[in-house]
Amino acid sequence: MIKEFLEYDTVRNNALKLANKIYKDGFIPDVIYCSLRGGAYMANIISEYFKILAKVNKFHPVLYAGVVARSYSDVAQHTKVFIDGWTYPPENLRPGDKILLVDDIFDSGRTINCLVETLMNSRGMPREDIKVVVHDYKYFTYYNEQLPIQPDYYCRKFEINSPEENRWIHYMSHELVGLSKKELEEYYFKDDPELIDVLSPYLGDK
């Protein structure tokens, strides 16, 4: 498996360019839903961009909200998604509202599919009024079936033709789990030695 360390400023810059593309495409959201935790950094940036656009171009404020969902396996080893809650419940959405649903990555896609289906079913929202936005889009070409909901906007797309081609993307904006001692030294301690006392007792081949 390929492992990539993705700098936070790369995500920031890509998110700004993607937000501009969404706007240029004529899609102005009423609500930006951030899928927590992974989508927070990218969604914050997109929300800020639309806040500026709303002020300059005199359109409606864009509500920023969050949703917490998690995947788990039941006794039959079927993966299911449980939604813990929404900071702005879908029941409050109005007919015609436009939605951006933002996450860091589309991997298995189960969580995104569950969230979009919940939005569509709870308020009868058409799919075209919901745009799925991710930084990284993994498309597994060897899967026999693809989930119905796929990203509408993404910064990078990886077509993965075999399990060996899969990649682990480490988002340096918020992730710490799974770091080796060598990775800590290269990506964290080298730039800021004070982090040695902060992280080394708990991470790095423990």
Question: Where in this protein do the model-derived segments appear?
Answer:
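Active-site-facing substrate-recognition patch
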Residues: M1-I28
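Alpha-helix termini
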Residues: K24-G26, F50-F59, Y88-N92, M120-R127
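Short glycine-rich phosphate-binding loop at a beta-alpha junction
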Residues: F27-L36
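Short, glycine/charge-rich flexible loops or terminal/linker lids adjacent to PRPP-binding catalytic cores
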Residues: K55-I99, D107-E117
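Structural beta-sheet core signal
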Residues: G66, L101, V132-V134
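PRPP-dependent phosphoribosyltransferase catalytic core
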Residues: E117-K206
